[in-house]
């Protein structure tokens, strides 16, 4: 008997989850449990793009977005030689704005993020939750320890080829060029991923996405699409420059602050711009 789509998705997921559990402490069991459950729901709730397009109940807007995504995926495989697997051949509709919420934390008066280590992915500067409430609860625990914490929504992520990542409602309505950028980026992670080296992994994926979008726009874009993407890229570049500027200023401020022996709080208050 041919295994069902559910069992095909379930068995490798459970194998990965079991391996993770064996390598983790008891305090991590609930975290891995929510991760396995969230990934399983994402896979089992997906349907092939062709089914959605053929379904008379699918809106005209969604049908158009799925057709665009299918064309982008075809370009990624045929022209960019990115992995030709089940990724982005299915679509999942979620009743929430993000697929994940990442928790990022730094110790008090530090810009060096706390790291968490996982099987396969290695050590990363974030911890993801499929539930916003669970992410916020974990963030509260970190703040109670004196950490600076941020909880941010994530529209997409890559399972690095372990599973067939679906298109998701959290990003399907991105403008065409930004949707292409997203898919090229996530597929690039399936090509090269060094566990524990987020800077290299993101730099590689960014290089692939930028080259891919340029080629895709040349083939399928129009002046309006090109102008919109150029403005998006410029805003992204300006925002990154702003972050780096204030990161440098904040780093200098932190280094100039001397904690008191009694409370640990700085003797001199921060001087914010």
Predicted feature locations:
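Acidic/histidine-rich, surface-exposed loop or edge segments in extracytoplasmic proteins
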Residues: 43-60, 114-124
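Bacterial Sec signal peptide processing site at the extreme N-terminus
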Residues: 20-47
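Post-signal-peptide N-terminal segment of Sec-exported extracytoplasmic proteins
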Residues: 47-79
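Generic structural signal for well-ordered, non-transmembrane alpha-helical segments
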Residues: 67, 74, 143, 237, ...
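Acidic/His-rich structured neighborhood in mature extracellular/periplasmic domains
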Residues: 71-237
